[in-house]
Every structure is written in structure tokens, then in C-alpha cells.
């Protein structure tokens, strides 16, 4: 499985409005058609599988370009330039670099479709297809010496990774995680919930904490 991960601390996606805009601009039916099997379903928000301990149901991902446009405007990108890209008050286009492991052919396909869809919507995407070592150095706390530079990346995740640490895929999100932490979330409320999950003595206590994520 794979997910589009944003760097929440640096660059374009430190603004939640722009993360939301991308979420609503993507066409999930196309991903299902081109990359899914006959049994594929459009996932819910978040990337935690429903079979994961602590899973809480969320709304299904939907495509809504009008809502995406509202989020772009909320972020200060109110007009488009001659190339069709949203620009802010300074005339700077909404653009980001999407990092992907070039050795993972399917992941490259995901990245290319994201680029195609977002540029049709009005966000410029620069693909950064690199080898494994360069990819890890841009997306992992361990291999970057806590200097993650990616703006967004295609992340592969595993069942083992989903359950590590405090579970629920938190190692991929927690900016303080020693190995992963690509999403660079340092929010105090998020850290407090992770502490609650860690301290849980019963499954009921764990689910109570998980419901707050």
C-alpha cells in the first residue's frame, strides 16, 4: 500500500488549506480504475486500514474541485496565471516537489497521475524520482539525520509499520520518531494523544485515545 504524504512543517503543505485542496482536487475514481483490482474501493480519509487495532471510521475521500478551489483561496491563491496555475498575491505559483522512489514502478505511476491531475486543477508538481538512498535521505529522520527535506512524497507503508510505536501508522506522522517521521507533525495535541496510547493498559483505553486522532 502507498499514501501521498505531506511535510506538515515546511514548504507549501505547512498550510492545512493546501493539504485539504489537494485532497479534494484528486480524482480517486481514476486511481481506482488504473491501479486497483476488481475489488478495489476508494479509501476513507487517513491511511489506517479498517482492520487495524484502534481504527476509527472516517469519511470517504471525495473529489470536489469547487471545495478545493475554496481552500486554495483560503490559502491566498485567488487567481490563476497564463499557464493555468494558482498564484498568490506576490504572483508566485502554487507548486511543490513530489519525491518518489524511482525503483518502485507503481509508486512512480501514482506520482505521475498526481502530477497530471493536480496540474489540470492548477497546482504545479515537479517530480523528483530518485534512488533508494536519496529517497530515504529526503523522507526519513534516521537517514536524513533529522533533516527531512521532502515537500511531499509517495510513502509505502507496511502492516508492521502500522503497528509499531503507538500504532495506527503514527511512526510515519510523528516528527519526533527516530526512524520515520516523514509527515513532520510536531503538534502538542497530537503528541499528547500518542502519550495516551502508550499509557493505555486495556484495549478500551487504547480505543478511547485512538478516537481522538
Task: Identify the function of each model-found stretch.
Residues 1-10, 33:
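Extracellular/periplasmic solute-recognition and catalytic clefts
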Residues 7-11, 99-103, 130:
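Short strand-loop junctions, especially beta-strand C-caps/beta-turns
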Residues 9, 18-19, 31, 68, ...:
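Short, hydrophobic alpha-helical packing/hinge segments within bilobed ligand-binding/sensory domains
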Residues 14-116, 212:
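Append "and occasionally in soluble cytosolic enzymes with long acidic Gly/Pro-rich linkers
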Residues 32, 125-136, 166-213:
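Extracytoplasmic/peripheral linker and loop segments enriched in polar/acidic and small residues
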Residues 119-174:
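Periplasmic binding protein-like
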Amino acid at each position: 500500500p502507498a499514501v501521498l504524504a505531506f511535510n506538515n512543517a515546511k514548504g507549501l503543505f505547512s498550510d492545512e488549506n493546501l493539504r485539504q485542496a489537494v485532497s479534494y482536487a484528486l480524482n480517486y475514481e481514476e486511481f481506482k480504475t488504473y491501479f486497483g483490482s476488481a475489488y478495489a474501493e476508494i479509501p476513507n480519509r487517513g491511511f489506517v486500514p479498517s482492520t487495524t487495532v484502534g481504527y476509527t471510521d472516517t469519511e470517504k475521500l471525495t473529489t470536489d474541485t469547487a471545495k478545493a478551489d475554496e481552500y486554495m483561496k483560503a490559502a491566498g491563491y485567488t487567481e490563476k496565471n497564463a499557464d493555468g496555475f494558482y498564484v498568490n498575491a506576490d504572483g508566485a505559483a502554487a507548486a511543490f516537489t513530489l519525491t518518489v522512489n524511482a525503483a518502485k514502478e507503481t509508486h512512480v505511476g501514482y506520482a505521475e497521475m498526481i502530477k497530471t491531475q493536480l496540474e489540470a486543477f492548477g497546482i504545479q508538481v515537479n517530480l523528483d524520482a530518485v534512488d533508494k538512498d536519496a529517497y530515504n535521505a529526503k523522507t526519513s529522520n534516521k537517514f536524513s539525520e533529522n533533516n527531512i527535506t521532502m515537500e511531499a512524497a509517495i510513502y509505502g507503508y507496511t502492516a508492521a509499520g502500522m503497528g509499531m510505536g503507538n500504532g495506527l501508522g503514527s511512526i510515519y506522522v510523528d516528527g519526533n520518531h527516530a526512524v520515520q517521521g516523514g509527515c513532520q507533525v510536531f503538534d502538542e495535541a497530537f503528541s499528547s494523544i500518542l502519550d495516551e496510547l502508550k499509557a493505555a493498559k486495556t484495549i478500551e483505553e487504547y480505543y478511547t485515545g485512538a478516537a481522538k486522532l
